[in-house]
């Protein structure tokens, strides 16, 4: 089983062409729904009493929501604005609300999960919750600038507790205080994790494992509407694919990254979660074949 832990949110996203207000979002939401095309994930998250029923139904359609807690108060909210090129996002407002006092725990039915993804979340909570699983075969985490700047030591401690780290290029540099991505990855692996995947947005990603470097290009798109959740969709597809195969060989991890690139490309083609919610498995397989043709020579 795969368990995803992190945030479920109500997002306000402002792009040059459209503004979405209070739509379903959150790192764990994107990651878990992306993973759901490969396996049935369990979600550990919290929402408030204002969380719309229609969004709860969406989560229930794709995920096991036994670990979704409902607390009195408002749901975690995020408000962000993209520049005209959709390459820079400015955070306008973050309201933790119920997420700020949520005390997460792993439901009994999730404790035997052999795959665990710790989506962008408080590193202290992540490090604590990974210990509540009985026997994890493969664990992975993500982090962002906010946690690196406010809890860097805890981020490093979290990295020691997982098998793989997924992080974007600028945050890898910020975390390690290095300018070269190879040096970044080596330093992160030196902290105890086995695999490092550095996301480079539209330019794909780099996988590092021991002395191996595996670069993968992003899937080329003519139209991008909303980059929100692309990195979370990438990571969710990665661990969802691995959980479906129940294998973590380096060859399977490479394949999982291809699926990650593909799922990230679907996420950015529409606004919010629509790129994922409109998907069929046949769409994914078709794009993977297109990707294979694109990179073959």
Segments from the language model and where they lie:
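Extreme N-terminal starter segment of soluble prokaryotic enzymes
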Residues: 1-3
């Amino acid at each position: 089983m795969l368990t995803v832990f992190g945030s479920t949110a109500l997002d306000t996203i402002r792009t040059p062409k459209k503004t979405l207000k209070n739509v379903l979002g959150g790192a764990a939401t994107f990651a878990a729904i992306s993973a759901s095309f490969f396996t049935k994930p369990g979600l550990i998250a919290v929402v408030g009493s204002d969380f719309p029923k229609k969004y709860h139904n969406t989560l229930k359609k794709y995920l096991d929501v036994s670990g979704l807690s409902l607390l009195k108060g408002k749901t975690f909210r995020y408000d962000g604005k993209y520049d005209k090129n959709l390459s820079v996002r400015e955070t306008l407002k973050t309201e933790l609300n119920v997420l700020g006092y949520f005390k997460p725990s792993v439901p009994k039915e999730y404790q035997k999960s052999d795959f665990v993804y710790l989506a962008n979340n408080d590193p202290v909570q992540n490090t604590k919750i990974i210990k509540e699983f009985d026997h994890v075969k493969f664990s992975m985490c993500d982090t962002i600038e906010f946690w690196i700047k406010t809890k860097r030591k805890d981020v490093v401690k979290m990295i020691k507790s997982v098998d793989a780290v997924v992080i974007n290029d600028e945050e890898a540099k910020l975390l390690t205080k290095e300018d070269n991505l190879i040096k970044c990855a080596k330093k992160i692996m030196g902290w105890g994790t086995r695999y490092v995947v550095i996301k480079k947005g539209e330019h794909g990603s780099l996988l590092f494992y021991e002395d191996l470097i595996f670069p993968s290009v992003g899937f080329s798109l003519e139209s991008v509407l909303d980059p929100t959740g692309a990195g979370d969709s990438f990571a969710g597809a990665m661990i969802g694919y691995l959980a479906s195969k129940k294998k973590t060989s380096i060859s399977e991890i490479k394949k999982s990254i291809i699926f990650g690139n593909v799922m990230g490309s679907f996420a950015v083609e529409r606004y919010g979660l629509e790129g994922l919610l409109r998907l069929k498995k046949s769409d994914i397989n078709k794009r993977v074949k297109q990707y294979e043709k694109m990179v073959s020579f």
